[in-house]
């Protein structure tokens, strides 16, 4: 059993390496930022670069999530190598400078060794991390090098038949059969393995590539693979909290000025050029709230004018500020991420109240299946599901306009198609007036009607479906568009507020840790700040990262123990773990079943013994009955008879 980490008082555990520990904790805290939604779409760029020349062999950009942006990368070996392998005599040796050298290079095998994880004895960059046989993990060679843990696989691509000595079609050799642009005739295909799709690509990964020759040394080149996420915003600097600075009061209503007749400019005056209009200011909190209430009124007035003759619309001041109504709708399927999926949204907002029944996608748990009228399973493949106009996907990871099927197939995430409505309650005038009247008798608590109950489901089947009866579709009106614009503006502000608060907290922790590190350096002679103060050392742990990682490791260990426990059980013990009703059924019928089995096994033997015993007793009784009907004759001795005569 392991000893506890703090078996002695903390003041006796002062570490002379405290500043270095603080530096490590600072780096760890800076990296533990809350992760985005798995359905967030980014602009991802993969680059293959020759580390010896700095030349880029391939740069592929695509839109997608961080889970499915692992495309096949196509490039030419000579674009990667350049002139590093050229021999002094181009007509004899291989290389990439001459057409003949490119053709001879195509005949050689090659092998690749990883530099991001170097095994013992594999050497360094000079050997291409291939210091001995067995270090190679991929390539195109007769011994078929492979690995189950490396991140990529690199093979030769399809070379067209009849492609001659690799002439360059752009320098006057276009009429020669087999000529290609740039003389490229050594195509390579790089694919990501399952381990590569799970790995972290925060830093470049390095590999060494060597050309296999039967004689002489194998030429070496080094290349790196880098992933760049272009639209991830930078971290905010230390300063005022933008969440507080944007809390502006409601704007004052603008006074309408009557138009005046323009006067001609005086003679000799220079013509005045109107300046550029001032930049539009982002609406403050007060304006956003008023826009929500105004949009709710316009939408309600369009659908039910009788309810808006005299009413009170109250915006709920406490969370949840929004509620969703599950609806049925037809989403659009895209092979690539559409434009509305690539917005820079962090998807950190969730819905705590969803009502109704609608369309569900993914592995919906039993606790949320009441929200599903129809549950669809995603098929294999990488594509995106965009929500219809006026709706959004409410997922267990947050709100998102698009879904990635790759994320749904790899995780336990689930989503429901919902309409978003602000938490605005509708009250009649009698209820509001009654709150200010002093009454001794109180009526029953009135039922609060929210905007979701009054207008829920309109975009997917309410007013929008009433066009045939003469009703205007709400989704196509300015009132609904104004309400949707107010909702989107408020949601965007909420997301920015959450991100700003998170980054402000992280920045504050970095400042505190930096001050602590500086104090430790100042009191280095005394053994650090804790030793100078003669107090226990306190260390900072970012719960958003450390706890999440710890729980993930704990969950992984529990799964491993569960699998180990199940593998150690016999088939009979495993039957009882499959379902609870099976255990109850077995325990109920086990007793009668055992009794019946014993009767079938020993019943015939016992029955035969009993029958034989009865037969013996009956035979004895019969013998006694027969002896009672006869008398026994006396025996006479012949000698005695003769003596009597």
From Swiss-Prot:
Residues 34-585 are extracellular. One of its GO terms (cellular component) is membrane. The mature envelope protein (Env) consists of a trimer of SU-TM heterodimers attached by a labile interchain disulfide bond. The activated Env consists of SU monomers and TM trimers. The keyword Metal-binding does not apply. Residues 1-33 form the signal peptide. A motif (YXXL motif) lies at residues 630-633. Disulfide bonds join 113-130, 122-135, 311-314, 311-538, 341-395, 360-372, 402-415, 530-537. Residues 447-467 are annotated as: Fusion peptide. A lipid is attached at residue 605 (S-palmitoyl cysteine). Residues 260-285 are annotated as: Disordered. Residues 607-640 are cytoplasmic. The 17 amino acids long immunosuppressive region is present in many retroviral envelope proteins. Synthetic peptides derived from this relatively conserved sequence inhibit immune function in vitro and in vivo. GO terms for biological process: fusion of virus membrane with host plasma membrane; symbiont entry into host cell; virion attachment to host cell. It comes from Xenotropic MuLV-related virus (isolate VP62). The record marks 444-445, 624-625 as: Cleavage. SUPFAM superfamilies: ENV polyprotein, receptor-binding domain, Virus ectodomain. It comes from the Viruses. A motif (CXXC) lies at residues 311-314. The chain crosses the membrane at residues 586-606. Residues 32-237 are annotated as: Receptor-binding domain (RBD). This is Envelope glycoprotein. Keywords: Cleavage on pair of basic residues, Coiled coil, Disulfide bond, Fusion of virus membrane with host cell membrane, Fusion of virus membrane with host membrane, Glycoprotein, Host cell membrane, Host membrane, Host-virus interaction, Lipoprotein, Membrane, Palmitate, Signal, Transmembrane, Transmembrane helix, Viral attachment to host cell, Viral envelope protein, Viral penetration into host cytoplasm, Virion, Virus entry into host cell. The lineage of its organism: Viruses, Riboviria, Pararnavirae, Artverviricota, Revtraviricetes.
């Amino acid at each position: 059993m392991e000893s506890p980490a703090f078996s002695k008082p903390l003041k006796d555990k002062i570490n002379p390496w405290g500043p270095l520990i603080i530096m490590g904790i600072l780096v760890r805290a800076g990296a533990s930022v809350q992760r985005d939604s798995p359905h967030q779409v980014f602009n991802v760029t993969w680059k293959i670069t020759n580390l010896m020349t700095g030349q880029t062999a391939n740069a592929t950009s695509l839109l997608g999530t961080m889970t499915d942006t692992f495309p096949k990368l196509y490039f030419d070996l000579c674009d990667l190598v350049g002139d590093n392998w050229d021999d002094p005599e181009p007509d004899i040796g291989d290389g990439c400078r001459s057409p003949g050298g490119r053709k001879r290079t195509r005949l050689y095998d090659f092998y690749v060794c990883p530099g991001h994880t170097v095994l013992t004895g594999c050497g360094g960059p000079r050997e291409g991390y291939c210091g001995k046989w067995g270090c190679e993990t991929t390539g195109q060679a007769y011994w078929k090098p492979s690995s189950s843990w490396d991140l990529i696989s690199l093979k030769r691509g399809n070379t067209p038949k009849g492609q001659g000595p690799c002439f360059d079609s752009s320098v006057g050799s276009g009429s020669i059969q087999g000529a290609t642009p740039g003389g490229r005739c050594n195509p390579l295909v790089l694919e990501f393995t399952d381990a590569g799709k799970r790995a972290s690509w925060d830093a470049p990964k390095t590999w060494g590539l060597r050309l296999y020759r039967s004689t002489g040394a194998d030429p070496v080149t080094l290349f790196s693979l880098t992933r760049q996420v272009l639209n991830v915003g930078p971290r905010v600097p230390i300063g005022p909290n933008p969440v507080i600075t944007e809390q502006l009061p409601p704007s004052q209503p603008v006074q309408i000025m009557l138009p005046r007749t323009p006067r001609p400019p005086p003679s000799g005056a220079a013509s005045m050029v109107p300046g550029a209009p001032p930049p539009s200011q982002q609406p403050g909190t007060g304006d956003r709230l008023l826009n929500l209430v105004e949009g709710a009124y316009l939408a309600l007035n369009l659908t039910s004018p009788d309810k808006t003759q005299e009413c009170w619309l109250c915006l709920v001041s406490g969370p949840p500020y929004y509620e969703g109504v599950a609806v049925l709708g037809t989403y659009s399927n895209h092979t690539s991420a559409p434009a509305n999926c690539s917005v820079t949204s962090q998807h950190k907002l969730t819905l705590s109240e969803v009502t109704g029944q609608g369309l569900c996608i993914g592995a919906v748990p039993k606790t949320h299946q009441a929200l599903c009228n129809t549950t669809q399973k995603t098929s294999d493949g990488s594509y995106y599901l965009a929500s219809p106009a006026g709706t959004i996907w409410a997922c267990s990871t947050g709100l998102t306009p698009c879904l990635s099927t790759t994320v749904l197939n790899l995780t336990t995430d689930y989503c429901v198609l919902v309409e978003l409505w602000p938490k605005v309650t509708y009250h009649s005038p009698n209820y509001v007036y009654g709150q200010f009247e002093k009454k001794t008798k109180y009526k029953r608590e009135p039922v609060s009607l929210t905007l979701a109950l009054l207008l829920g489901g309109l975009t997917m089947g309410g007013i929008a479906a009433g066009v045939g009866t003469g009703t205007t579709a709400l989704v196509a009106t300015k009132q609904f568009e104004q309400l949707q614009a107010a909702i989107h503006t408020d949601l965007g502000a909420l997301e920015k507020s959450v991100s700003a608060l998170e980054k402000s907290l992280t920045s504050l922790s970095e400042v505190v840790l930096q001050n602590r590190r500086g104090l430790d350096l100042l009191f280095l002679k005394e053994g650090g700040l804790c030793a100078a103060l003669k107090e226990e050392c306190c260390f900072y742990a970012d719960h958003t990262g450390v706890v999440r990682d710890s729980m993930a490791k704990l969950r992984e260990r529990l799964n491993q123990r569960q699998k180990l426990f199940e593998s150690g059980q016999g088939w009979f013990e495993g039957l009882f773990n499959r379902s609870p009703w099976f255990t109850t059924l077995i325990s109920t019928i086990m007793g009668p079943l055992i009794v019946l089995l014993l009767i079938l096994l020993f019943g015939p033997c016992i029955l035969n013994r009993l029958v034989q015993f009865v037969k013996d007793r009956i035979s004895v009784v019969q013998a006694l009955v027969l002896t009672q009907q006869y008398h026994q004759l006396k025996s006479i001795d012949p000698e005695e008879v003769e003596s009597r005569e």
